[in-house]
Amino acid sequence: MANSKSAKKRATQAERRRQHNASRRSMMRTYMKKTIAAIEAGDKEAATAALATATPLLDRMATKGLIHKNKAARHKARFTAAIKAL
C-alpha cells in the first residue's frame, strides 16, 4: 500500500490508466474479431469493410503505446493477405 501522498496519487493514476487501457484493448479486440469473423464467413465485401474500420484503430493503439507498432503491422498484413486470398 502506498504511504506517501505522491505514491497514493501515482497508484490512483495507474489504476485509472489501467481501466482506460483495458477498455481500449477490448475495443481493439472486438474490431479484430469482427474482421476475423467476416474472413471466416468468406464475405469479401464485409471483410474489407471490417478491415477498413480496424486498420486506423490498430494504428491509433500502436501510436498511443497500447500495442507495439510491429504487432499492429503484423495484424494488418495478415488480415489483408487473408482477404486477398478469398
Curated annotation (Swiss-Prot):
Pfam families: Ribosomal_S20p. Coiled coil: none annotated. Residues 1-27 have a biased composition (Basic residues). Keywords: Ribonucleoprotein, Ribosomal protein, RNA-binding, rRNA-binding. GO terms for molecular function: small ribosomal subunit rRNA binding; structural constituent of ribosome. GO terms for cellular component: cytosol; small ribosomal subunit. Residues 1-28 are annotated as: Disordered. The keyword Lipid biosynthesis does not apply. GO terms for biological process: translation. PANTHER family: 30S RIBOSOMAL PROTEIN S20, SMALL RIBOSOMAL SUBUNIT PROTEIN BS20C. Binds directly to 16S ribosomal RNA. Belongs to the bacterial ribosomal protein bS20 family. This is Small ribosomal subunit protein bS20. It comes from Aliivibrio fischeri (strain MJ11).
